[in-house]
Structure formats: C-alpha cells, structure tokens
Amino acid sequence: MNVGKKSNLKKNIGYFCRHAAVSGLVLSFLSRVAKNHSPSPCSPPPRAQVVSLGAGSDTLFFRLHAAGKAPTLFVELDLPEVVSRKAGTIASTPELAAAVGLPPPPPTLAGAPSSRKLDRIVTERYALLPCDLRSPSPISTAIRRAREGGEGGEGGGGEGSTSGASFAFDPLAPTLFVSECVLVYLPPEAGDEVLRDAFEMLSVGGKGGEGSGEGGGSGGGDGRRSGGGGGGGGGGGAEGAVVVFDPCRPETAFGKQMAANLRARGCELPGIGAATDPGAAAARLRRLGWESRGEGRGAGEGGGGRGGCSAADLRAVWDRLLPREARAHASRREQLDELEEFNLIMEHYFLAVGVKRGGEGKALEGFGLASLTE
C-alpha cells in the first residue's frame, strides 16, 4: 500500500469520527428534548430547533429527515453565493424539494426538472439563509430578516421560497447550534461574536425573540454583557447548546506544518489561536456565557464530561466516547494498522460542547460529550 493511500485511510477514519460524533450529539439533543416532554391530550409535540453555521453542502437535515428524526425547524446559514447554489439544487431536485417542504419543480420540455433561481429557502420546517458570520450579531440578524420577509437587505424571499411569515423560529424552544470547521476561519473577535450571539438569542428578551433585533447588543454596542456571559447564568429563556468542531494545537510541529500546507493553498486559519487546545475551547465557551456547571474530567481535557462546557480532542473522542462497534467497523473497513500518525492527526482537532439552561427546563441536564456513550 503506498503512502498516499495510507494517509487517505487515516483521513477517512478522521472524517468518520467527526461525522459520527457530531451526528451523535445532534441525535442526543433531539432525543433529550423529546423525552423531557410531558405529553397530554391537548399538548402539541415538543419543539426542537437546530441551527447549522456555515453549512455549505452539508446534508445533515436530509439525513435526519430520511430517518424520521428531523427537528421541528432546521436552519442553515452561509454566505449568499453558497446559499444560492444550494437553494437552486434543492429546489430543482424533486426529492430534496419535498423534504424541505417546497412544491415540486416544474418539468422542462425534456421531462427533467427546471433550474430554479433562489437566494434563500424558507419553509415551516427548513430555512436556508444568507449570512456573513463576520458581521455583527450575524445569527440573530439573519433570523430576524427571515421573519421580516427579507427586509433590510441580503435579498428577500426569492422565486420558489415561501413567505417570511411562515418562518417559525421560536426563541423559547430548545435550540442546538452546530459549527463544524467554521470559527477557525474567522478572526477571534468575530468567532466570539458568533458564540455570544447564539447564547444571547436563547436568553430572556434575547435577540432571537419576537420583535427583537434592536437593543439586543447588535453590533456589540449597548445591551451586551462585557467579557463573559455569566458562566452559565442564563437561567431564563430557552434551553440550548452549541457544538464546535475545529483544528487546534497550532504551536506543535505538526500544527505548524498543517497551517503551512493550508496557507500554501491560499487558506488561512485566523481563528485557530482562539482555541489552541480543548481546554482553551471549553474556557472560551464559558467566557461567552455557556454553562460551566457540573464539570468533571470524564470526557477529555476540557472537563465537563456530564454537562456544562466539555471538550476533547478527536483522539479522545475516538478512544473513549464513540461506540466500540463503530470504531471496530471503521478500523476494519479502512485497514487501520499504523496508529502513531493517526493519533497525531486526531490530536489536532477538537470537539467542544456548551450548554445553556433555561427556566425550569431539564431536557439538557448532563448534555455534553459524554452523551455519546449513552
């Protein structure tokens, strides 16, 4: 087996570990919300929301939908040009259009779906919205504009998209924010803004609430808490969590080479210094308001194994948190037999989870990396 093929095998298992861990946390979040619901004959089904930051071509919503496990609302945010391409693909593909709740594309004379130009998609269960995460209050601004039908720029309900009035983001519903290889591409202060904005959207009177958008600290001005967000205060508002996956340890020889290789391809990592290791990633979440209560060392060097802010590198996730049968299957499939380089690669990526309590809600009690073992 040549060296290039061996390297690809290690990367394949790394991708598998990342995919399995992030998907597992999303499923755990949705399961906890559903189990915490106390049904009665008159009560509606529990609401749960997922917001994917810098979603790109990710297919998480469609995988959840196919498995019958999609949340009440799934929101994807990315740059306008990325959103336009993805929206056109979804709206022009009958199966994808049906999954998100769009009408089927009109057939062309040749019988194939016609191309549909969209700048966004907004339905009752899915939203694909333009958003520059480098801007002030990026998440809350994108969601507010979707509720207002696109007023204020960034395009407004394009051809084939539904009315902004049908966009049913609920600031009091349990919400999970997912950031996979996103914050590392933002300057540290912009990454902090994203994490703080997500936290404040779940707070009482936060920027995700009805009629909000002003006075919620937009642009980092009045109304914003300074420095930390209270280290797990947030006792009111909605329950929520954030999952962050990014590279780390830029100061090691391997980390320096990794950054140099990416730089040679025109890809800078301006945000890698904001979370240099799992412990720093967990500390960053705490500083920006995400809960630190209930910490322990069980899930990795970031602590918080049974709840609060927890973080670990991908090696620890692979060794201690993923189900044994999943690891065995991946190892056999990819013929993993050289562990030294594999471990080195895995040590240079981290997964972090932050939690926000909300009122009397207990759905996310104990939610963290250790949820992968449940």
Regions found by a protein language model. Name each.
Residues M1-L129, P136-E151, G157-F167, P171, ...:
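Rossmann-like AdoMet
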Residues S40-P41, G149-S163, G208-G237, R297-R306:
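Intrinsically disordered, low-complexity regions enriched in glycine and serine
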Residues A67-G68, E193-V194, Q257-R263:
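Short secondary-structure boundary/capping segments
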Residues P130-S135, P247-K256:
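Short, conserved secondary-structure transition motifs
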Residues P138-I143, Y185-L202:
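A short, conserved alpha-helix within the catalytic core of class I
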Residues P174-E189:
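A short SAM/SAH-binding and catalytic strip from SAM-dependent methyltransferases
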Residues V204-G209, G236-P250:
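Conserved beta-strand signature within the Rossmann-like core of class I S-adenosyl-L-methionine
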Residues G255-E374:
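Rossmann-like AdoMet/SAM-dependent catalytic core
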